[in-house]
């Protein structure tokens, strides 16, 4: 890679959004997106809103969530914010109830995530519990709440998309809980698909590093720890095994949700969209 690393979250432009013709992409239908205040969640909110679906953007960050709503409106879409703590069942229930008032819930994008880097023997159990709650238990709970809404919709068709990772395929040191929950999300994905009778689909998305705040804020600390430049962290550490030496953007990941939710993916039932620049499947 050339030049200095830009640690700012990329700007999302309408021309970057994948727009698809789809009978379910209309204002009468609703998509719930978690982690919508920034990164992939924000981008997915904007992408689904730009495709004509009403979006309930859920996040604990109220300022970021409201900013996402305004961005969606600038793209000509409709979004509404719901503040939710994904460790609280009653708040998730309230969020789904709010979404149901907007229209027929058809889509759920489980994207919210946090990170903690530590070896197993040093890993704080409180942090384990928090990551497990936000990144695996909450997606299960939300799917449990959303599936009945999809079933009772006019045609009973809908989909749940889960944001996995290359860490749902391979593990790396000092990320034990991230590895665990991402592998678990693939199990949840396949379980939903198995019970969906071909009408309620589920899929996961596995990418390498994406230029989200979660990933970008790791770069300076990793550079300091390793005694290398931020550029070297991205090129040699984050993208060391990737055939493409640049980070994927949030909207590129969001477009995978658009595709996965669309009629073009009607045979994507329990499958995983692995878009990782060759990290998992190739080597030298």
Which residues fall in each region the model found?
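Substrate-binding pocket helix/loop in short-chain dehydrogenase/reductase
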Residues: 119-120, 124-132, 238
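Active-site helix of classical SDR
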Residues: 143, 181
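Short, small/polar-rich loop/turn modules that mediate ligand/substrate recognition or access, typified
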Residues: 197-201, 268-270
